[in-house]
Amino acid sequence: MMMGKEDLGLSLSLGFSQNHNPLQMNLNPNSSLSNNLQRLPWNQTFDPTSDLRKIDVNSFPSTVNCEEDTGVSSPNSTISSTISGKRSEREGISGTGVGSGDDHDEITPDRGYSRGTSDEEEDGGETSRKKLRLSKDQSAFLEETFKEHNTLNPKQKLALAKKLNLTARQVEVWFQNRRARTKLKQTEVDCEYLKRCVEKLTEENRRLQKEAMELRTLKLSPQFYGQMTPPTTLIMCPSCERVGGPSSSNHHHNHRPVSINPWVACAGQVAHGLNFEALRPRS
């Protein structure tokens, strides 16, 4: 049986693992097979009772053949089964590791350590952001200095910091904040003043608009022309009035209106006077 398989030179191996891996077939022709095929004629038929069996590669092998072949399987099938077994063991270990709580216990200290570090950093940031506490004497002295000079040069900063037992940076920050507060207060005062000016100008604008509307109404009304003063009148002197004759009116003799053209009136009065002189008798 074994010799017949060696002559045939075909080794069929089917490895079945626990994980039902796909069928693996190893067809390796040997040199003896090529020699035997060269010796045999092509029209020769094989005896089915002989030791040499026909193997149809395209058909699925029977159970008996599989059982016989598994006993003489190639080393590749052994290696594949070993690899599949290791793979199953590895999967089982990984599955138990995921479900266990040991990993969570190992991560927890790291998280706690990271939280502790962040808490320490936050505490350090809070201490660095603490406000400067000044005494009443220090505040009063700084206010007096600010009234004299709202800005300081480096020498003045060092001298003031040494005198008040502070650092130059603290003095500089205090002056910056004080200037900012002063500017803010001045801005608020200017804003209030501008608001009052705007309100006053708004009222004045409303008053002027009202007066302009009243003037337009009077200009368009017809009574405006009736209330106008009469045109210019001439006043005659008493002597001319006596020469001209008695007035038809008994009152307002001194304010009798005459013609608008003064030259015509004067010419008539002169001519009238000359007539009287001509009629006067000569002595």
Swiss-Prot record:
Read off the SMART domains from this record: HALZ (SM00340), HOX (SM00389)
Region of interest called Leucine-zipper, as start-end residue ranges on this chain: 194-215
Regions of biased composition (Low complexity) lie at 73-84
Print the keywords alphabetically: DNA-binding, Homeobox, Nucleus, Transcription, Transcription regulation
Which GO BP terms sit in this record? Answer: auxin-activated signaling pathway; negative regulation of DNA-templated transcription; response to auxin; shade avoidance; unidimensional cell growth
Q: Name one GO cellular component term.
A: nucleus
Cite the SUPFAM superfamilies for this sequence: Homeodomain-like
What induces this protein's gene, according to its Swiss-Prot or TrEMBL record? By indole-3-acetic acid (IAA).
Q: Name one GO molecular function term.
A: sequence-specific DNA binding
- What is any Pfam family matched here? Homeodomain
Assign the protein's first listed, main location to one coarse class: nucleus
DNA-binding residues (ranges): 127-186
Free-text function comment from the UniProt entry: Probable transcription factor that plays a role in auxin-mediated morphogenesis. Negatively regulates lateral root elongation.
Q: Which family does it belong to?
A: Belongs to the HD-ZIP homeobox family. Class II subfamily.
Q: What does the annotation say about its assembly with partners?
A: Interacts with RBR1.
Record protein name field: Homeobox-leucine zipper protein HAT2
